[in-house]
Amino acid sequence: RCTTIEVENSQTKFSAAIIARNKDFDLAALKLSGKPLANLNLFSEAPFALQNVIVAGYPFGDKVSTGVKFNLGIISSLAGPLNDPTLYQIDAAVQPGNSGGPVVNETGSLVGVMRAKLDETIIRRAFGVAPENMNFAINMKTLLKFLEENKILYELDKEEIRDRKTVSETLDKATFMVNCYY
């Protein structure tokens, strides 16, 4: 368990506290000591297979560079491993450090939260090949259930049309690297 949590991005740094968590889904809600420069709206419609998505995060933390990184992909399947209905399969390239980061549609509305990628060692042993871009995000239904169960307020998308530059700028302000100190 963390004794201190800090979140930071290229513009701000805050202390944070866990206000809700779900170990089954590897989800946590953090209360920040200040107000972020931007928030993400939650997508109000059901995402669909082949929908374009953008994953934002800090792959390998600050070891590569300190800024947020973006990867493009699609929703490959509306189910996770073994037909898990709480996950989407996406093909955007992800690494350690993307977990917990936003998965948004082309207009920057949240459609999921990055969770995991297939374990390369296990898949290679089972099938003789390495998996390529078989990654999984917590879907909106699961995220909304988590928020509602924990009485966390949220805002559904107003379906604004945003260009990719605006989406990039918003994600840069709204995505944080989480640092846990013991």
Place the predicted regions along the sequence by residue.
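Short edge beta-strand segments in beta-sheet-rich domains
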Residues: 2, 68-70, 85, 129-135
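Catalytic nucleophile loop of clan PA
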Residues: 93-117
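Conserved active-site neighborhood of the chymotrypsin/trypsin-like protease fold
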Residues: 1-65, 83-87, 149-159
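Soluble non-cytosolic domains of exported or imported proteins
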Residues: 44-48, 69, 94, 98, ...
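Terminal peptide-recognition signature
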Residues: 16, 28-30, 50, 55, ...
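A contiguous binding-surface segment within folded domains or other stable secondary-structure elements
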Residues: 76-80, 85, 103
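Short, compositionally biased
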Residues: 67-79, 126-129
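C-terminal cap/linker of serine protease catalytic domains
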Residues: 15-16, 37-39, 59-63, 110-182
